[in-house]
Amino acid sequence: MPELPEVEVVRAGLAPAVTGATILGVEVFELRSLKRHDPLAGSFESLLTGRSMQTPARRGKFLWIPLDSSPRSAIVAHLGMSGQILLRDPGTVENGLLRIRLYIEHPEHGELWVHFVDQRLFGSMAVDALVPTVDGAPAGLGTDEALLPAQVSHIARDPLDPVFDDAAFAAVLARRRSGIKRVLLDQTLISGIGNIYADESLWAARIHYDHPATALSRPRVRTLLAELRRVLGRALAEGGTSFDAQYVNVNGASGYFSRSLHVYGRQGQPCDRCGTAIVRESFMNRGSHFCPRCQRM
């Protein structure tokens, strides 16, 4: 599943192409890709056609593009397991996985097509109302507005958000008896982190994935947050993690952070720090990868 770095790469790639562009038309080829859209608010196509788009924003794994509508609304996209948002020249023939197409015109770049491609259909697009943030601060990366889509309002801030409160997160951990990885994957407590970056950050911080969150000292919490930001930042700089063709940027190119992974997917291989074989254990219907020597309980 695309995590924070992958979604941020898409957001940054979309920004110059869609900011200030007008939506000329919309085609929906797969209604299941609108599962988060409320038809009572109006049809997806009618709510978008003729609207101007503003700078894309992101919180955690959610991406949205504000519209010039009144009342305020936005296109909300979640990539799910295999979703892609691609910028295409008019006339481009996409594969059979094309679910939604936006016809847009930018004052500088001319006409473009925005394609939502999704193999496994866990992703979605929707038009949603913008609501005030709980803390009154800008909603996420890419926006100065304290407004975010209603369906994103329950999502916590992510570690790369300038407004993320380290002390408040430490207080949350102090009240949680569950393992630290379970907390990191809870998008209502801290967002944007999935299996890959949880495993990589915990390895970097030398913390076992099942270590009780409440038992982490403040210095270890500071170390964990620092490693989360370092790992996410490096992944972002390297274009995200691509194991197959399912994750690509807006131009269809893959990221290469998979070459920098220390534990994820490396079970049986030697730890880059101590040489001990990396172990994979079942966890929440997925796997946790760790070094049994560097990350002791």
Swiss-Prot record:
Enzyme active site: P2 (schiff-base intermediate with dna), E3 (proton donor), K61 (proton donor), R286 (proton donor)
Substrates-to-products reaction catalysed: Hydrolysis of DNA containing ring-opened 7-methylguanine residues, releasing 2,6-diamino-4-hydroxy-5-(N-methyl)formamidopyrimidine; 2'-deoxyribonucleotide-(2'-deoxyribose 5'-phosphate)-2'-deoxyribonucleotide-DNA = a 3'-end 2'-deoxyribonucleotide-(2,3-dehydro-2,3-deoxyribose 5'-phosphate)-DNA + a 5'-end 5'-phospho-2'-deoxyribonucleoside-DNA + H(+)
Cofactor-binding details, from the entry: Binds 1 zinc ion per subunit.
Keywords per UniProt: DNA damage, DNA repair, DNA-binding, Glycosidase, Hydrolase, Lyase, Metal-binding, Multifunctional enzyme, Zinc, Zinc-finger
This enzyme's EC code(s): 3.2.2.23, 4.2.99.18
Protein residues bound to DNA: R120, R176
InterPro entries: DNA_glyclase/AP_lyase_DNA-bd (IPR015886), DNA_glyclase_Znf_dom_DNA_BS (IPR015887), Formamido-pyr_DNA_Glyclase (IPR020629), FPG_cat (IPR012319), MutM-like_N-ter (IPR035937), Ribosomal_uS13-like_H2TH (IPR010979), Znf_DNA_glyclase/AP_lyase (IPR000214), Znf_FPG/IleRS (IPR010663)
GO biological-process terms attached to the record: base-excision repair
Cofactor: Zn(2+)
CDD domains: EcFpg-like_N
Top-level taxon of origin: Bacteria
Pfam family, one: H2TH
Zinc finger (FPG-type): 262-296
Single GO MF descriptor: zinc ion binding
Similarity-based family: Belongs to the FPG family.
Oligomeric and partner information: Monomer.
Role: Involved in base excision repair of DNA damaged by oxidation or by mutagenic agents. Acts as a DNA glycosylase that recognizes and removes damaged bases. Has a preference for oxidized purines, such as 7,8-dihydro-8-oxoguanine (8-oxoG). Has AP (apurinic/apyrimidinic) lyase activity and introduces nicks in the DNA strand. Cleaves the DNA backbone by beta-delta elimination to generate a single-strand break at the site of the removed base with both 3'- and 5'-phosphates.
Name assigned to this protein: Formamidopyrimidine-DNA glycosylase
Organism: Leifsonia xyli subsp. xyli (strain CTCB07)
Classification lineage: Bacteria, Bacillati, Actinomycetota, Actinomycetes, Micrococcales
